[in-house]
């Protein structure tokens, strides 16, 4: 699963905003996405992905919200 799909999956399951650390941890715990080097997703990767998809995500008060 692509990282953006994993972020949406995690956020749909949780009603309300999440921090990038919470999202990265949930993706890792559920095994939804793994980097090419085998390491778990980082909060920086989550943040970069969210910035690439402003039509899907918004940032408010340090939390990421799903817009779709």
Located regions from the model:
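Short helix-capping/hinge SLiMs at alpha-helix to coil transitions
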Residues: 12-15
């Amino acid at each position: 699963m692509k990282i953006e799909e994993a972020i949406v999956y995690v956020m749909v399951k949780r009603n309300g905003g999440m921090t990038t650390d919470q999202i990265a941890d949930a993706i890792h715990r559920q095994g939804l996405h793994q980097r090419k080097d085998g390491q778990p997703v980082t909060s920086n990767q989550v943040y970069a992905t969210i910035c690439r998809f402003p039509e899907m995500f918004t940032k408010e008060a340090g939390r990421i919200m799903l817009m779709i």
